[in-house]
């Protein structure tokens, strides 16, 4: 399942292409579900031939629209009615709002269909950077100072919003839409003029914005895999050649060095992995999470955020971290499918009557 009504639509297509290429077609029957930028659901025929580009996944010809409310029946109209066949697992490869934020996960829960990755709570908390930061604070995770603003606050008094940032955080700072990933709508600000422009940009993508103090430190990331007993990968480091790791550097230029594994001490790795698992449990994670940190020159570790559906593009950090840890891409995907089935089976044991 990929695409979606989100600013990260194209990222999702790239992720879907990479995952589909890696799936073992002798082991899995692959049925693509494309959600257009307008939010329309289109299903394609079972994939029996290799997919070489994202255009093939957009079904400009040959796809058929369907209602997501009857997902099993739409995908297997005859078989499902006879209860001979149904969807085993949905793999949501959706990024951003209307996909990674708990909405799709809620629908799949109502339909009682197993799905890869985080549930409703973890997905929504992981999408909203403000809620996420509140949860991290509650479990005692060190993080950079931040402030949150609603669009109505900015509209009412841009001057007050800017003054609050300057007094509480100072420059440089980073302005981000609260509910977007892939560095969409993010700006680095060094003065009032840049801050005003950054607010205006971020509010184009969300009604809520978070502003974070700038941290002078290395950008370290780690992968978390599992359900109630999660494990961590090696750590990696992002060294962007640009001013910061924005959308263009991530997905277009490749103008970033990924150092895997990152050079850290045993003590620093222990701290990072422990904090990553605490963050995973704080949002009630399942399946996978990529946790992002800052590591300062004096060894202080600050959590930045978690991503509940990290990218699976060929140059994405999450699969590369696990590859370095000894888990190949195709095996990683199969583990995620098994974790989805495990979590779903556990939920089926829950009583709903008393």
From Swiss-Prot:
ATP binds at residues 166-221. Its EC number is 6.3.2.4. Its cofactor is Mg(2+); Mn(2+). Residues 133-338 form the ATP-grasp domain. Binds 2 magnesium or manganese ions per subunit. Keywords: ATP-binding, Cell shape, Cell wall biogenesis/degradation, Cytoplasm, Ligase, Magnesium, Manganese, Metal-binding, Nucleotide-binding, Peptidoglycan synthesis. It comes from the Bacteria. Its main location: cytoplasm. Mg(2+) 2 binds at residues 305, 307. One of its GO terms (molecular function) is D-alanine-D-alanine ligase activity. Pathway: Cell wall biogenesis; peptidoglycan biosynthesis. The keyword Oxidoreductase does not apply. It catalyses: 2 D-alanine + ATP = D-alanyl-D-alanine + ADP + phosphate + H(+). Gene3D superfamilies: 3.40.50.20, ATP-grasp fold, A domain (3.30.1490.20), ATP-grasp fold, B domain (3.30.470.20). It is found in: Cytoplasm. Belongs to the D-alanine--D-alanine ligase family. Cell wall formation. NCBIfam families: D_ala_D_alaTIGR, PRK01372.1, PRK01966.1-2, PRK01966.1-4. This is D-alanine--D-alanine ligase. The gene is ddl.
